[in-house]
Amino acid sequence: MMLILSLGFLACLILKEILCILCFTLFFLVYLDYRFKDKRIWILFILFSLLSCILVYPKEVQQQDTYKITEIKKGYYIGKNRGSKILIQTDLDLSFQDEVKVKNIEPIHTDDNFTLFSFTRYNENKNIRFRTNSVEIIHKSTSFKSRLYNYLKSKPNSSIVLSLYYGIHDESIDEIYTMLGYGYMSAYYIVLHVLKRKWDETRIRRILLVFSVLFGHFFVFTLSLTRFILYQLSTLLFTSKPNQIAFTILCFGMIYPNQVLSISFVCPLLLQLVSYFCTEHKWIVQKMVLLGLMFIYFKKVNLISLFFFNIFRKLYGLIFLFGFIVQDLINLKLPDLTIHYAPRILFIVLFIIFYIQCLKHFQWKYLWICIVPFLEIYCNPFFQVYTLNIGQADCSIIVEPFHKSVVMIDCGQNLYRDNVERIIMPFLENKNIHAIDTLILTHDDFDHNGGYDSLKEKIEIKEVIEDSNQSVHVDYPFYLLLSERESKDTNDSSLISYFTYDHLTYLFMGDASKQIEKQLMTTYDLKADVIKVGHHGSNTSSDPDFLDSLDCKVALISCGYKNKYGHPSVETLKTLETLHINTLCTSDCGSIAMYSLFHFSFVVTNDGMFGIIWT
């Protein structure tokens, strides 16, 4: 009973929205009445439901001037003062409990894209919404925690030790083991297994529980460590496995209500339920659960890590135990045998059904879920047009239904980040795009073709188009307009792409100016449902008469957040607003995806906006 109630409480926390929680509560009460016929359970769950509403309700936290360093990550620090947290990016060498004064606080913003990790959203779930890079040290801590960290950081094997003890991720360690805290947990069970041969197990568990709390105090209370401590406490309080799991869920949800979907909590929970309820082929079910979770959370799975998961978990436990004294540790990065896949809703729903059914009774036919990623890739009937959010640069990807063809327009680079390495290639891998049929480089500017040399080394590019007289070889109308034109500069020589699919027409302008727009008006009778606005929304493009003649419904703008050029210009935005053209800008909403199937077309943005395009 308590396990069912705790799972209901967990569902309320996941839903977050108060109205959704109330609706779920009504349906769940009906289920509880049917299952238990006990009004006291009703009352208990109503209390849990109300508690979840309180826990998920947004709280206004006032930013402070001074903070103490409570977390250290690779490339940044987390400062805390009362209930306020801030992300600190600085070259200063800070340690735990150092006190700092901060200035120039601003909201956290990253260039978010579909299927890729969102640093902004990750921090929002930890109630961290602001950042600064202007820091002054007020007081250097001399606490034991600080001195211990500085000592370990100075060791030759510090990268692996810091990853296992502090969760400061290093490329030499597979990320899943640090996120799930398997270094500490495996070490715990190794010690428990050795000591219980001579002493009472309950007493040993109590001692190790105290040690775990002390470890968190002197190192860091990661999500995985907190969950593990709660579970170990539950084993001392309850003899029933379901009650132990229920206690862990309830306590963790109350402490971290916004992080109940973290892999650090979800993965151990699902594996615990498999361990308790699944009676047949438990090893296979565990591997299938890990496979699904890796795809859902990381969009990839290393097959070596998957099949030898238990062996590597124990290995990390041994390294965790002897990390203090071993000076040179081997590189633990596993050989790369990785499958990339970004699950859609179909896979997630099937995974949930598979999991529930396997808890009841495993059947070999459930393994059909393994082929879903491969079928889903080549069975997508939608025409897809993606505008990636790569800062002050351009990159769009056009995918024909069933992966029949892939066209990329531009692959711009960034002075402060390798867009190809960090965004374009991970996106292509997650979409299982292994070749580009046609790459159109609109013109010779770094923010449009700067990534070409890097891209061609990482993926097959069958054809590159840099001239308007070339043809795009696809099975739908695709034209490069105005091959003969009068151009004064590189921007005006931009290739202009015009294509049609499912009765929806697209016009991609590159960096062409108003002069070129006027030449288009006199040369063609153009209509376009969607326009990729010229020159990142600069006022050198987007002539009002030109836009009006197109009869556009949607305008796409690719530009960097708070870029130094002021793109998109107020003038351009005003023109688009006056003409009642719906405008989507990557700096505001992240990457943009447009889908069409026959006469049904819609747009989705990375920040969750959805809209239907009527033609």
Tell what function each PLM region has.
Residues 1-7, 28-30, 320, 328-382, ...:
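C-terminal regulatory/interaction regions
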Residues 10, 18, 22, 26-42, ...:
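Hydrophobic alpha-helical transmembrane segments in multi-pass membrane proteins
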Residues 37-62, 376-377:
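Transmembrane alpha-helices and immediately adjacent membrane-cytoplasm interface residues
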Residues 51-177, 421-422, 426-429, 435, ...:
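Membrane-interface helix/helix-cap signal primarily in integral membrane proteins
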Residues 125-232, 236, 480, 505-514, ...:
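Aromatic-rich juxtamembrane segments at the membrane interface
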Residues 257, 361-438, 469-530, 538-541, ...:
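Core dinuclear metal-dependent hydrolase active-site scaffold
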Residues 434, 440, 444-472:
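Active-site HxH/HxHxD metal-binding segment of metal-dependent hydrolases
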Residues 519-592:
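Cap/insert and terminal regions of metallo-dependent hydrolase folds
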